[in-house]
Amino acid sequence: MAAPYRQPEEAVDDSEFIDDHHDHLRDTVHHRLRANSAIMQFQKILVANRGEIPIRIFRTAHELSLQTVAIFSHEDRLSMHRQKADEAYMIGHRGQYTPVGAYLAADEIVKIALEHGVHLIHPGYGFLSENADFARKVEKAGMVFVGPTPDTIDSLGDKVSARQLAIRCNVPVVPGTEGPVERYEEVKAFTDTYGFPIIIKAAFGGGGRGMRVVRNQADLRDSFERATSEARSAFGNGTVFVERFLDKPKHIEVQLLGDNHGNVVHLFERDCSVQRRHQKVVEVAPAKDLPTDVRDRILSDAVKLAKSVNYRNAGTAEFLVDQQNRHYFIEINPRIQVEHTITEEITGIDIVAAQIQIAAGATLEQLGLTQDRISTRGFAIQCRITTEDPSKGFSPDTGKIEVYRSAGGNGVRLDGGNGFAGAIITPHYDSMLVKCTCRGSTYEIARRKVVRALVEFRIRGVKTNIPFLTSLLSHPTFVDGNCWTTFIDDTTELFALVGSQNRAQKLLAYLGDVAVNGSSIKGQMGEPKFKGEIIKPKLLDAQGKPLDVSHPCTKGWKQIIDQEGPVAFAKAVRANKGCLIMDTTWRDAHQSLLATRVRTIDLLNIAHETSHALSNAYSLECWGGATFDVAMRFLYEDPWDRLRKMRKAVPNIPFQMLLRGANGVAYSSLPDNAIYHFCKNAKKCGVDIFRVFDALNDVDQLEVGIKAVHAAEGVVEATVCYSGDMLNPKKKYNLEYYLALVDKIVALKPHVLGIKDMAGVLKPQAARLLVGSIRERYPDLPIHVHTHDSAGTGVASMIACAQAGADAVDAATDSMSGMTSQPSIGAILASLEGTEHDPGLNSAHVRALDSYWAQLRLLYSPFEANLTGPDPEVYEHEIPGGQLTNLIFQASQLGLGQQWAETKKAYEVANDLLGDIVKVTPTSKVVGDLAQFIVSNKLSAQDVIDRAAELDFPGSVLEFLEGLMGQPFGGFPEPLRSRALRNRRKLDKRPGLYLEPLDLAAIKNQIREQFGSATEYDVASYAMYPKVFEDYKKFVQKYGDLSVLPTRYFLAKPEIGEEFHVELEKGKMLILKLLAIGPLSEQTGQREVFYEVNGEVRQVSIDDKKASIDNTARPKADVGDSSQVGAPMSGVVVEIRVHDGLEVKKGDPLAVLSAMKMEMVISAPHSGKVSGLLVKEGDSVDGQDLVCKITKA
């Protein structure tokens, strides 16, 4: 047990403490009576309470040299108050009492006190503090009750009796019932006389429980029943009384102290107006700007009332002050209040010490507490920090506190209970963790201290009200000190909260999951081959001196776009003598080789060097296409955040993105307004050149994207998708086809013409013919050619394009080039160096960049497709480079890995069945899906056609045949189309014409409601990929922003004892070390993972996904299913009001939950029929546990 504080045993002249005639007493404000003094004949005190108030009392008791005794329920056996006492005893035995009932077991508590030689019992507040019978039992047992006499508690603890007392003393009261009210009919009679609004209050007890404001007849009966039920549960007595409810009053209370000789003093007032559900949230002492005459009348009336009943010990007289500064007596609380701390701070008086010493027989004068000696100095403000979630109606949160760091410093006082790391917060008790009291010489200084202290707290593992308190304390009305009792309910902007980011703990949750379960990144095979620090290259100038790359280069082709616009840019590109390079390393290269898995942190790490080395590049292909959804889906990154960061780091090179025409970056057509919205935001965020294509070369589809980019004022690079072999007269797509297509595209006024050879089947001789023919027809039109090096002829083809008149060609850094990626930039530069087509890049700088990527590729080795060389067979199967590696992975996942050759052949078959279509995302996916379908079902081409009416084709195949991807050149294949679609529609125009515009404002509101905030970029992401976006946001809510985590630790756990760093933002670094992974808990299926964070040990509980446990947890309500009703909080079901099959209306009560002394009605979210009721009265539930379903009528 905690050892009490002991003063040195020294000779003391007791007379100096008890002789109230000594002159020096008049010069002393507050004396302490030691336990061995003539008055303090008592040695041991028991506190009949829990949480922070016993700790507060124990501290003073130790200062008075008293021995201390704590009591606790079984559920409270790990609570801090038990450890702060010299002795601690459990109330009864396990299961004998409910968690709250244990602290209401008066006989058992008295029995414990007698058994262990207790002399004084302090009741604290709540529980038995206002129970006169308990006080009588204490005194009857020969002990001293630290509080008023039982008779006083009877007369004042009953608010109706206190009201009658006020009337006799000519103290103004609010109109209300003359006596206790037990029946609904009595309440109804009062409203018939006085009207609404009214307030129903528990006659015994406080803290806002058993209290309801009723504003209309419809809510009267239910409010009466809830108030009486809460009062009975909290105080053991359901009696209530009724008063007229005052609108926007202030709540002012006066701290009183009385002794056994009829002396009463006040310790001035507190302003407790800031309340929620009649529970005080923030208190101020003294009241700011209360008129002096009003203050004097309130203080005088408070003392008058106390003296009229010979009040003994500490108590509080409470008043309401209306907007005309008229005051009305409410009640006297015959106990110490939660907020007594602020009075102590401004008066310097220890109220608890005074309580104990008065109970021992001291007079106020002996304690130096005469009214003329009591004054205030400065201001004090108290906040109650609770485990409540303000964003969910302040529903109490439960769980384990993982991190607890307190505030401190000058003028900060903390009175805590169960606020410590490792504490288990249960639904059984009050949700308060700690009281934070700050004092200052002025109200504003005190307010600023509280705000600072709140920001200083770090509490993780449970939700807290700290963000709300910070918002409240910063509101102009609070700053002015003009709050009223319903200020919180009346001020919705208080709930525009900026919550704590909780970044470290969320990051630990992810790292812990990787430590226990390994990486969950789809497509990852094993751990990285490279685990060292990547060495960044140095760029040298012509004299061999290192370039300063601490800042990015600011000179490049982008400056022409920014300063002169897209048209001038196009003219400048066309006028340029050399053939420019677009570097694809940041997008298509890693898409083709590493499954699009390269993360933002690794791009930014080489960004400044890239801006210098490639300053004369046509563009960096770095965004759009598959990188957009993969960023959210697999890397858990925001693609817009990536774009913003890249743009800042590389301000000089134009950024190019891939736009799938009317699809945006999605896989099927979207309403036109979604495309326009997307392009507008992409341009705003940093994209310069939009390479717009349509997967079927459908010009109607392509036109949507082109017009959207024009509207966004971006550079339009309208693109022809190259497929087949134009030199083969048997092939579908010949030179005439491409030239006719180019004519249609040029009519749409693009700035640049793109040629997209997605499979790498553009042979050098075909390249010369195609590019040369276009150049001849359109001599002023810039041409940019994109290819893949799958067949190994990419370098030759790109050189051929340059020689035929192309203005820009694609390449990738050497170590990320070849095979399904783009041709080698080093090889192209070497081939064109010194010629009229020289790209104008520094080869040494380009090679230096490549040294970084050579290391990085090893870091991403788990995503390699293990291709070993060129595949000229691509001229037969025509699988796009970006799809080939993904198709290999998909085949292995489907169990077709051993049939890869067969899958490639099936790709040719599928392409022919679909009409030899242009193959690029999303149509390439259609062909790939059909190929795998053919292999897995062992079908021939004829089987597919003959059995089309009965086969369950992949969804992408049906969408293509339906026309949702546009119209293919030459039409759809028949009879396959009609047979496969059966009764589905057939579109003969572009799909966007059949789609209603998206309600973008509604989407934004939906995102805001679901995730707390929403930007236009969020709307754009949702429009493209609703489910992917929602899943990503939920992941981030759980694990935070993982883009800051070094890739090695994103993909694999560190070694035990290995230290590594994570830079959360500039100047904020976490120093982490994995310490241990605990054993599997058979009860929970979890393992504890221990990390050291900035030298502090933290732990997280992680579900072991490999463990087989008996999961008896209740099913959770699916928030996406409106028919499912979940519990709004953890608690106990105290009442069920429905049954299966019952028809209910929206808002009808379904059940009542009780948690932390608060009851909450679960209401029907909509009308319908109840089914699947899963709870019964007495059941314990957690937040979001499924209660029932309501099927809409």
From Swiss-Prot:
Q: Which InterPro entries match?
A: Aldolase_TIM, ATP-grasp, BC-like_N, Biotin_BS, Biotin_carboxylation_dom, Biotin_COase_C, Biotin_lipoyl, Carboxylase_cons_dom
Sites binding ATP sit at: K159, E243, H278
Q: Does the keyword Zinc apply?
A: yes
Q: Which residues form the active site?
A: R335
All copies of domain Biotin carboxylation, residue ranges: 41-493
> Domain named ATP-grasp: which ranges?
163-360
Which of the seven top EC classes does this enzyme belong to?
ligase
Identify the residues that the record assigns to the Pyruvate carboxyltransferase domain, covering every copy.
579-847
Which amino acid positions bind a divalent metal cation, per UniProt? D588, K756, H786, H788
**Which pathway or pathways does this protein act in?**
Carbohydrate biosynthesis; gluconeogenesis
- Report the EC number(s), separated by commas if there are several: 6.4.1.1
A GO CC term attached to the entry: cytoplasm
Output the Gene Ontology terms for molecular function: ATP binding; metal ion binding; pyruvate carboxylase activity
Q: Which cofactor does it need?
A: biotin; Zn(2+)
**Gene3D superfamilies on file:** 2.40.50.100, Aldolase class I, ATP-grasp fold, B domain, pyruvate carboxylase f1077a mutant domain
Q: Which reaction does it catalyse?
A: hydrogencarbonate + pyruvate + ATP = oxaloacetate + ADP + phosphate + H(+)
Q: What is its main location?
A: cytoplasm
Q: Which residues bind substrate?
A: R587, D588, A589, H590, Q591, R660, T921
Task: Tell me the ranges covered by the Biotinyl-binding domain, including all copies.
Answer: 1116-1191
Q: Which GO terms describe its biological process?
A: gluconeogenesis
Q: Which residues carry this modification: N6-carboxylysine?
A: K756
Localization of this protein: Cytoplasm
NCBIfam families from the UniProt entry: PRK09282.1 (NF006761), PRK12999.1 (NF009554), pyruv_carbox (TIGR01235)
Q: Check the record and name the PANTHER family matching this protein.
A: PYRUVATE CARBOXYLASE, PYRUVATE CARBOXYLASE, MITOCHONDRIAL
Q: What does this protein do?
A: Pyruvate carboxylase catalyzes a 2-step reaction, involving the ATP-dependent carboxylation of the covalently attached biotin in the first step and the transfer of the carboxyl group to pyruvate in the second.
State the name under which the record lists this protein: Pyruvate carboxylase
Annotated organism of origin: Aspergillus terreus (strain NIH 2624 / FGSC A1156)
